[in-house]
């Protein structure tokens, strides 16, 4: 990884899962910001320089879809990974998440690989710039 340390925002209302992902991502050299609710996650997203988001689908209050929708509205190019206990991809998530993983089945190394891929894909995409200035 380059000299810039990527920041990953993890959002989950279940503390054990949140801490496991925090330790996993920090061990790989990422800076991790944790939020314990969708609303807290949105606040953190707005106040921190976040490079990617890993969030739980099923949270009380604001679920993962609502959080992903708001993140897409605020900063459309942010990579989003949604974790869910449910294996089926819901139609409403299409276009909101870059990756959908079934919670509990993924190996920790697999999550790291996928986070790295999301960040690499983002880095290789041309960054959306301001609209061209027509003189």
Label each region the model flagged.
Residues 34-43, 64:
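Helix N-cap/capping motif at the beta->alpha junctions
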């Amino acid at each position: 990884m380059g000299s810039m340390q990527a920041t990953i925002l993890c959002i989950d209302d279940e503390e054990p899962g949140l801490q496991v992902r925090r330790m996993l991502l920090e061990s790989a050299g990422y800076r991790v910001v944790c939020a314990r609710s969708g609303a807290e996650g949105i606040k953190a997203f707005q106040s921190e320089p976040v490079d990617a988001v890993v969030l739980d689908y099923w949270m009380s209050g604001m679920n993962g879809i609502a959080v992903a929708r708001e993140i897409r509205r605020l900063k459309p190019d942010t990579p989003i990974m949604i974790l869910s206990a449910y294996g089926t991809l819901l139609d409403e998530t299409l276009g909101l998440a870059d990756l959908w993983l079934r919670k509990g089945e993924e190996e920790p190394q697999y999550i790291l690989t996928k986070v790295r891929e999301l960040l690499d894909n983002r880095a290789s995409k041309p960054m959306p710039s301001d609209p061209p200035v027509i003189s």
